């Protein structure tokens, strides 16, 4: 018998997401991190709308919205001339916008959530080595007291960054290369009069090539920005090599760190307004690689976040992609711990997330070289892709067939939000996302006529049996459908938004996965498809 259900190595945003999602499903976790305390650095800053949707489902959206600042767009300057402004516009039906939040605040909020779920982080404790057999993972930890501890876990999740012990222990390849560019980062205040809420990108270009660059991302606080810029020669780490050959991330501890004078020198060259930098909170040199593992796990061990993929920070994709890795994996591991994982459920983590990791690595590398404005396609689609709202799992072995949707999202697509849903005893409408905050699958049964209500009851009963009771069910009724005898929880689609957002047909079943993606659509709702699908996912 294992000492713990899941051991998580690394307590950054990815590890904390995995731990919180497992703990709130009753899975016993240990979360270890080699650092004695959280780093007070604004490393990852951009928070994508899809991540905010995840935080809504996890139960920390209010805290995030109170702490973050909105990102309205980006101001572009080339050789001192202002270019076209990039507005971060999204369709009105998308519930959240782009935001900026320093990574240390993201980690604080996630760790607070973990504590509320009954978990904690063991700091100063590092994974040293591990081995697995068909039944358990045997791990060795180094302790802050100087000793070691041996333990067994049913599963191990490596969220331990670009130099991951878990990735190396699995023998995964990490193909890619380092980029020649080096950047220095600084968290400072400036006194310019540029509009609040906008990132700033100012470059110097000669013969079509950028030879100097300044990027400023707004942070919470008055005129406060996380600035990145080319590293001057006296701060370069170009000759330094990391022991494992992976050159990526902050390297301030390996040499002199940038001071205000270095940042001010770049501002004097590239700032679109004369300004003075003050109140330097931290600074470092940042080196970049692009790499991805050949697989996201093996047996009882998995990798997520920077342990699985690293790439340029353009578009704020890295942390957000890692959070989605963890969010995809956690519900599947929880099902396995509870003995309700069908064949292929855990394997679907690699099948679903690795193609997305490849796409993100390729796209961020392209943007680092040419900018987001060089992307083909219309700007609206580009913005939805950057917001991570177009990523999905069509064709996955654990979702239904594409083509089952009449006119709306297909199995594998993100489940969209909608408003105007009315409970009989509530005077105000609610949004669909409020129904999807549960920990299990949610089955939505749409009825546009009273004749379909009996089949909704039958569909719910059969689905709950197939899911071993681990299923939330709600009937969604067209505005004029009366259902006094319905035994299910029900809402009325008061503004017809659900029908339009989903292209829902009368008598249809829509199954939403715990990670907010559609698993199946089926008509009629009481046919064999839904129970069979749930049995496949969760075992018989």
Segments predicted by a language model, with ranges:
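Core Rossmann-like FAD-binding/catalytic domain of the broad FAD-dependent monooxygenase superfamily
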Residues: 1-381, 385, 474
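Helical substrate-recognition/capping region of FAD-dependent monooxygenase/halogenase enzymes
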Residues: 2-5, 9, 24-25, 78-81, ...
């Amino acid at each position: 018998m294992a000492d713990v259900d899941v051991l998580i190595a690394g307590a950054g945003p990815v590890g904390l997401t995995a731990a919180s999602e497992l703990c709130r499903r009753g899975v016993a976790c240990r979360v270890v991190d080699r650092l004695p305390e959280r780093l007070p650095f604004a490393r990852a800053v951009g928070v994508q709308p899809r991540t905010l949707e995840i935080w809504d489902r996890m139960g920390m959206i209010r805290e995030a919205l109170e702490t973050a600042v909105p990102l309205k767009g980006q101001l572009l300057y080339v050789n001192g001339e202002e270019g076209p402004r990039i507005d971060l516009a999204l369709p009105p039906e998308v519930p959240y916008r782009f935001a900026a939040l320093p990574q240390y605040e993201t980690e604080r909020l996630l760790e607070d959530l973990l504590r509320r779920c009954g978990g904690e982080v063991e700091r100063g404790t590092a994974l040293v080595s591990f081995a697995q057999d068909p039944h358990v993972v045997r791990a060795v930890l180094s302790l802050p007291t100087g000793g070691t501890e041996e333990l067994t876990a049913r599963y191990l999740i490596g969220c331990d960054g670009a130099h991951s012990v878990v990735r190396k222990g699995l023998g995964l390849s990490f193909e890619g290369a380092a980029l020649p560019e080096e950047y220095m980062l600084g968290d400072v205040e400036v006194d310019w009069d540029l509009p609040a809420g906008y990132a700033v990108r100012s470059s110097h270009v000669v013969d079509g090539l950028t030879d100097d660059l300044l990027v400023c991302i707004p942070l919470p606080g008055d005129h406060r920005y996380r600035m990145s810029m080319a590293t001057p020669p006296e701060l370069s780490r170009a000759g330094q090599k990391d022991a494992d050959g992976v050159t990526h991330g902050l390297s301030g501890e390996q040499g002199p760190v940038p001071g205000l004078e270095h940042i001010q020198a770049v501002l004097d060259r590239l700032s679109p307004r004369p300004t003075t930098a003050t109140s330097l909170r931290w600074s470092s040199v940042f080196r970049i690689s692009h790499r991805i593992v050949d697989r996201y796990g093996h047996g009882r061990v998995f990798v997520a976040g920077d342990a699985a993929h690293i790439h340029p920070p353009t578009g704020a994709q890295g942390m957000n992609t890692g959070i989605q890795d963890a969010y995809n994996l956690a519900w599947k591991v929880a099902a396995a711990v509870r003995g309700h994982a069908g064949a292929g459920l855990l394997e679907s983590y690699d099948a679903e997330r690795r193609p997305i990791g490849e796409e993100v690595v390729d796209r961020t590398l392209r943007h680092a070289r040419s900018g987001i404005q060089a992307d083909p396609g219309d700007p609206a689609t580009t913005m939805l892709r950057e917001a991570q709202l177009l990523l999905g799992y069509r064709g996955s072995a654990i979702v239904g067939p594409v083509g089952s949707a009449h006119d709306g999202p297909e199995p594998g697509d993100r489940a969209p939000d909608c408003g105007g849903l009315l409970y009989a005893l509530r005077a105000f409408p609610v949004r669909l996302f409020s129904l999807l905050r549960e920990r299990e699958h949610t089955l939505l049964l749409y009825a546009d006529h009273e004749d379909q209500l009996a089949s909704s009851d039958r569909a719910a009963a059969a689905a709950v049996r197939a899911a071993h009771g681990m299923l939330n069910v709600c009937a969604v009724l067209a505005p004029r459908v009366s259902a006094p005898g319905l035994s299910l929880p029900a809402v009325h689609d008061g503004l017809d938004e659900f029908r339009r957002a989903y292209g829902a047909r009368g008598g249809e079943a829509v199954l939403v996965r715990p990670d907010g993606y559609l698993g199946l659509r089926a008509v009629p709702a009481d046919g064999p498809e839904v129970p069979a699908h749930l049995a496949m996912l969760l075992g018989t």
